[in-house]
Amino acid sequence: MNNLKVYVTSIIFLFLSSAIHSSEIGNKMKITGEFQVKLQPLDSYAKGAEGINLGRMSLDKTFSGALDATSKGEMLSAMTSTKGSAGYVAIEQVVGSLSGKKGSFVLQHFGTMNRGKDRLILEVVPDSGTGELTGLSGKMLIKIESGKHFYEFEYELSTK
């Protein structure tokens, strides 16, 4: 189980390729900040076969900056026997404040790595915003620099 935790942590670090600030782009806002992440192995339903390693982890984050929030979620991952090829999906609910507006929203992750070349899609689930974050849409980028995690979040709050 400990090897699985190291493996999944390695996948996340490989996927996640700044100072805190906020800027407006049309109706969209763009903020950056730092976050801490804690991953813990969970019992898996499915077991990998024929060189595939499947994993399931809990995901706990604390965001700082214009996104002052915590999140909880789950991640599923698959690592192939080919070095640098893997994939993961995750769902996390973020609860707190975004640029002073309180509420929650859900982020969905989809990441693949093809022999070391990574691709990550991290978006707000449509209609998942609550409270003052109702109508939230957006995309998040994640970077790791010198062992620290940073986010860049471009979002929009519609009044529809």
What label would you give each PLM region?
Residues 4-6, 14-160:
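Targeting-peptide/extracellular-domain and disordered-appendage signature
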